[in-house]
Amino acid sequence: MTEAATQLPISLNILVDSIREAANSTLDETLRSKLGQFMSSSAVSELMANLFESYVGEHEILDAGAGVGSLTAAFVQNATLNGAKSISSTCYEISEVMVYNLIQVLDLCKIRAMEFEVNWQQKIIESDFIQASVEQLLIENYSPKYNKAILNPPYLKIAAKGRERALLQKVGIEASNLYSAFVALAIKQLKSGGELVAITPRSFCNGPYFNDFRKQMLDECSLNKIHVFNSRKSAFKADNVLQENIIYHLTKGETQRKVVTVYSSTCANDINPTIFEVPFDEIVKSNNPDLFIHIVTNEQERELANKAGGLPCSLSDLGIQVSTGKVVDFRTRENLSMEYISNSVPLIFPQHLQRCSIVWPITKAKKPNALIVNEATNNLMVPNGIYVLTRRLTAKEEKRRIVASIYYPDIANVDTVGFDNKINYFHANGKPLDISLAKGLWVFLNSTLIDKYFRQMNGHTQVNATDLRALRYPTREQLEDIANQVDFGEFEQTKIDEIINQSLQLM
């Protein structure tokens, strides 16, 4: 280590952060949103770099979607202090504005490495990371080159028939979002024993769109550490990012460790995060074939997860299914009616689900109230009867993620009814539910127990049918007993929770 290195007056991360802030101010907001590009602050970058477990020796580090290079700089700062002999950096970035600043940051990294007598090499690749990676992976006898990867990938959906989807399929990757595609490609380019740290939306932890991604991640890597923020806006406060983000650390080719370390903090600058160790089989339940990743941050959350996750039944055990409504309004516009008229049936939209009950019809509403009955719509309807409904997207004013309502058949004198595809409906093999079972489900789904449990499972406001299938439920007898205790007309949270706690002996 040179004498200058021992007297560095300012951290590399602080220098880089000033470059990041200057670059951020020059970015066009519309373009940034289009690219799904949100840069890591020095606090987030340090947090991520601190999760790596090995800095000694030689490092080949990949930073895909590098921005100004904040993540690489944070790694360099740690590695030079902790025994690194050489660092070879590969940064992918396609924005000219970012590349201009990235060059400056890598020059600072080079100076830092030289001062600590660490051999330094760098490469900036101004190409699309997905295309370049696929081309690499398809080379005969390809051998992974990186032993470190640090990522803050773009957050954008991938079109079902888009160019990216076709490229990814060539190397066996199914991805619905750029962020999962970037992480999946980085994993494939890591050597066995290589470490990956990424910050992404939490949405990959559950839901059908990320099944393939979770399977690849957990098949090929050990999930070792997770860092969660207690506020949606904590990680990217300056960028108005409302997604709930998490940071995670993986080791490729390592047998899954028995314990996952979960860190939680109020924000990236929090110097005293809560640290909680959780058995892996409580993070990823063995009885969940979709490999949902269930994050608990303290003993209270763990107890709640064990209570809710330890309930005896699946939906199939109860003879119940949950499906998404069949009516996609824009595909059958000609068969929609604002008013309930002759030869039509009720069409239930999220607007009709209010305070855990159904309000129908709604005059002067934005959405229709009825569906015309004809050959084109016959397969979009279900038999009129009792169903439990939930919104797929939670309204901003709702305090709970799952808001359940009971649909009763006496709403109209009809044989069938239509449910919009932004609604989930519980049914018995396509037919209505028994009243006692429906009431029991209604109480259970609207309980604080399930709301808290669902928030642990789910990092966004969507409530998909797959998520509802993944829940555990009381027995049929317990649900019927719960229904018998409902002696109130309008929704009352306190009474709902009292019934659930007493009936399921959760106190």
UniProtKB/Swiss-Prot annotation:
Catalytic reaction list: a 2'-deoxyadenosine in DNA + S-adenosyl-L-methionine = an N(6)-methyl-2'-deoxyadenosine in DNA + S-adenosyl-L-homocysteine + H(+)
GO-annotated molecular function: DNA binding; site-specific DNA-methyltransferase (adenine-specific) activity
UniProt xrefs under Pfam families: Eco57I
GO biological process annotation, one example: DNA restriction-modification system
Source organism, top-level taxon: Bacteria
Enzyme Commission code: 2.1.1.72
Protein keywords: DNA-binding, Methyltransferase, Restriction system, S-adenosyl-L-methionine, Transferase
Physiological role: A gamma subtype methylase that recognizes the double-stranded sequence 5'-CTGCAG-3', methylates A-5 on both strands, and protects the DNA from cleavage by the PstI endonuclease.
Family the UniProt entry places it in: Belongs to the N(4)/N(6)-methyltransferase family.
Oligomer status and interactors: Monomer.
Name of the protein in its database record: Type II methyltransferase M.PstI
